[in-house]
């Protein structure tokens, strides 16, 4: 792997991270558990010393297709089919939200915004880098360190008036 590819992955990862964290926070994922299971996850994260609002955020993205799922699915579909694939991904995420009884639109918006970003940046950073970048972005929130990730998400939520 060349250094240029590594830089593209890092840039795509940062863009994906900002896309899904800011959209999910704006749509209120840290405020309360929006779907079944999110409350339990939030409380378990609080119990290990994490932030409850950050825990709700993490629980909501595990239990329903929010902007993290929308960003990843749209990145994959853009890679496979081009911009049309991104629109199909947005539709699939919207359907997934309805199946989960999730009243929100964060996942659909996340899919649409990353589709636009990939379309605009495609001459410089291809969709395949956004797939890898999004996997890494999700790992920083869900797979690395729950306590500290929840604290960071809680601070972002507080700055955006979406949590305590």
Curated annotation (Swiss-Prot):
Where would you say this protein principally sits, based on its record? membrane
Membrane topology, as annotated? Multi-pass membrane protein
Is Membrane one of the keywords UniProt gives this record? yes
Per the UniProt record, which residue ranges are transmembrane? 3-23, 76-96, 105-125, 126-146
Name of the protein in its database record: Uncharacterized protein MJ0527
Q: Which UniProt keywords apply?
A: Cell membrane, Membrane, Transmembrane, Transmembrane helix
- What is its subcellular localisation? Cell membrane
Superkingdom assignment: Archaea
| GO CC terms of this entry | plasma membrane
Protein's organism = Methanocaldococcus jannaschii (strain ATCC 43067 / DSM 2661 / JAL-1 / JCM 10045 / NBRC 100440) (Methanococcus jannaschii)
Keyword Membrane recorded: yes
């Amino acid at each position: 792997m060349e250094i240029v590819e590594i830089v593209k992955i890092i840039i795509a990862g940062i863009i994906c991270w900002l896309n899904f964290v800011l959209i999910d926070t704006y749509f209120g994922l840290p405020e309360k558990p929006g779907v079944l299971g999110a409350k339990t996850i939030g409380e378990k994260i609080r119990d290990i010393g994490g932030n409850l609002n950050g825990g709700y955020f993490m629980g909501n993205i595990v239990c329903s297709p929010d902007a993290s799922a929308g960003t990843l699915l749209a990145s994959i579909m853009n890679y496979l089919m081009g911009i049309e694939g991104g629109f199909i991904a947005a539709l699939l995420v919207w359907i997934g939200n309805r199946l989960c009884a999730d009243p929100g639109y964060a996942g659909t918006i996340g899919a649409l915004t990353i589709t636009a970003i990939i379309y605009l940046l495609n001459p410089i950073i291809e969709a395949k880098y956004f797939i890898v970048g999004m996997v890494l972005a999700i790992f920083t929130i869900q797979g690395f360190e729950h306590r500290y990730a929840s604290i960071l998400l809680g601070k972002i939520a507080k700055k955006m008036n979406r949590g305590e």
